[in-house]
Every structure is written in structure tokens, then in C-alpha cells.
């Protein structure tokens, strides 16, 4: 039995593999829009394990697997033995014998890595405190749809250096673009935690306006991620000057787009004028989670399919 491929961090795939995935996502999305069935995963089963609650992750994976002809089973740790102390290694061996692919959304990256080590089937990171590769897979596809290749472009990240930020930084190394990060003091990027090879693809800016100047894409996330609720009051004060507003978008490139992984808090990390404005592509970005993850699951379970991609 060959060892399965997993998708735990953005850097798990090469640039060539991402080129394929983006082309495949476009092909799958086009078929979806034409109401043409595509069932390469007929009779396959996805198990989704949630320790962190979600709307978009569950919906996109569950609907996506059904659209590919398979079925999806939802587990949360409160209602399973994982929440009662069963070792992750034991759960991985059992669950992977009863399914064809597993998606996990949890807190610690080490949990998903341990699960993958003992799994007989592919494991996908649906989100951890450290990384959110599926989100950036969809985000970059969305940028390509609207503005073309991301290679050589500039992304401005404004706000907390969280899991989404870490994944943007990994993506910059793999796909050769620049990320400018602006965070309040004390919230800076930790290159080792972000899993970076070097620091040549990102720069830190104390002033968020300068980070956005000339950017092709401006993006942010909530100021208080899940698991950090106890810090909310302090974070509201610390991040007050890091709201993406119309002034920041005005200094970006004229064709710049705005992204947010959602859910968003208007009036906190982004103004209503920006997220609901003409440069915002957040709804395409959210929909593309569905199509990008279909391409991802197909790739992990079947491999490259020649001839169908444009």
C-alpha cells in the first residue's frame, strides 16, 4: 500500500502542482456553472472532524464531496471518543480504515500531523491555529480569476499574524510573490512558527498604509481568532489603527482587490465601505472554497487527470 499524500501546509505541494490545481479548479467550476455532473469520487467517503466550529469549511467540504459523487460524514470531538481522551493515533487508524479521505479542523497543528502519520488515507488541514491552506488555495484561485497570475504580485496583510497570514507567507515562497505584513507591536510574524524557509518574500511594515501602498491585493482577518477570546478586549485596543478602510484601498494599485476569509466584523478589521465595495471579491472567494477543495480532494485521491484541464 502506497503512503497517502496529505495537505497539512501550503508548502506540501510544488508550484507545478498548484498550477495544475488552479487549472483543475477552473474546469470543475465551469462544469458546476453549466450544471454538468462530475462524479470521479463515486461511492467514496469523506470524514470531517471538527474541534473548531465552522460554516464555510463544513458546507464547502460536505457539498463538494456530494457534488463529486461521494458522501461526507460529520464528526465533532464533543460527540466522539476523540473528545473523551482516545489517542489521536488510535482514532486515525480506525477512521482511516472506514473512509477514503479525512478533513480535520482543530486547534493544534501537532494533532493533525499525528493523525496523518497514522492514517491510511489522505488527510486535509481544514484549519489549525498555525495554518489554513485550503483558504489560501481558494484565495489565490480567486485572484487568478480576477487579475491573472499571482507570481510577482504584492499582497498586503493588515492585522493579526495568524494562521491565514502564516499560510499567505508560505504561499509567497512557493508561488514567488511578495507579502507585506503590518501588525501592531507584539503581534509580528514569527518566521519559524509560520514554517518559512527564509524571509525574502515578506516584509514587515509598522504603518498599515505603507503596507497597502502599491499592493495588488489587500487582505485581513478578524482581530480575535477562535481560542483567543480571553484577549478580545485587549486586542480591540491594540488593533484599532489596523482597520482596512477606503484610504488604505486608495493607496493600493488601482486594480487591487480586497479579500477576507470570513466571517467579518464590519467596523473592526474592515470598514463596511471596503468589504461591500467594488474592490471586494469576498463572495467569489467564499464560493471558490467549494471548487478549489473539490479539485484538492480529487487530486489527493486520484492524482492528476490529463486532458480535461484547459
Where are these regions (language model features)?
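Anion-binding alpha/beta catalytic cores of soluble intermediary-metabolism enzymes, centered on
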Residues: 92-95, 100-171, 260
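Rossmann-like adenosine-cofactor binding region
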Residues: 197-272
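Active-site cofactor/substrate anionic-group-binding motifs, chiefly glycine-
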Residues: 45-46, 50-98
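Positively charged, low-complexity intrinsically disordered leader regions
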Residues: 1-59, 63, 131
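Adenosine-phosphate binding glycine-rich loop
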Residues: 255-256, 261-310
